[in-house]
C-alpha cells in the first residue's frame, strides 16, 4: 500500500547561513552604518535588535530575501514579538516553526477526508502519514495539501510504493 509522510522541518545550518549573509549585508549597507544592529539565532528563536521601526522592517525584509536565496520557506519564520530593549532600541524575537501542530494536522486530515479520495491520513506526533491504494491518489493528496493555506512549510518524505 503506497504511503508518504507530511512533515514540517527546517534546516538549521541553512538558517545560520542565511542569517550570516543577512548580517554581512547589514554591515555593508550605508543606511545601517553606526546603527549597531544585531541578528542572532538561539535554538528555535531569531533575535533582532536595532534602533527604530524602519530599520527593523528593513532587517526583516533582508532576512526574508536571504531565506529565499537559500531556498528556505519564509513561512518557517513564525510569531514575531516586538518589544522595547534598553535605551532607544527595539528587540524582535521570531520563533522558527518546526513540526505540524495538532490543530493544523486535524485540519489537513479533515480536508483529505472531505475530498472523497480513497486515502487515509493518520497523525503521528508532529507529522502525518498518508496511505492510499493508488499512487495517483497520493499525488493528488500532495497537491491538495500544497494548495491549502495552512501557514507553515510542509515537505513530503518517505514516499513508498
Describe the function of each predicted region:
Residues 1-13, 17-21, 25-108, 114-115, ...:
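N-terminal intrinsically disordered, cationic/polar leader segments
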